[in-house]
Amino acid sequence: LIALLKQQKNIDARGIELSQKGVSLAVSKGIAVVQGDADADLFHYPDKGFDFVVLSQTIQATRRPEIVLRELLRIGRHAIVSFPNFGFWRMRAHLLLKGEMPVTEDLPYTWYDSPNIHFCTIRDFFDLCAQADARIDKFVALGGGRRPLPDSWPLAVKNVIGEQAVFLLSQKDGD
């Protein structure tokens, strides 16, 4: 996501990545990345030091999602958070019909070796945002082929049909 934003919007982008392999891959693509842990290292960054902070496909793998979300909004004026929707109908059907956790293109790990420790639906993330005093400025559910689902569709439908979710957030108090 950072590479896409850098390419299309010509932004000054920097990242934090847990794995050394991920750091090496990002650096090879010209993205400034340091190795770090969102659960432990965000407190090092200054208040409102960034216009936008991006947490892409990671919140479900953090130990303390609410604290991480609050830290994102402390260090950035806005946060962009994306994650796989565990409420997606195919995942529900797989669990119901096969009785086992699904392994998909977006979630390529078995349950016992997955970095995902908090299985989150789109509806769950709305609740987390309320708990963390995060204002949802924009929300997009992505369906097949990463196409945005229509804004007019109800949240309940997006929670079942959306494979991924992307949120643009800011602090409720406007800080």
Residue ranges and their predicted role:
Residues D12, G49-D51:
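Structural signature of beta-strand start/N-cap positions in the alpha/beta core
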Residues K48-G49, I75:
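Alpha-helix C-terminal capping/helix-to-coil transition sites in glycosyltransferase folds
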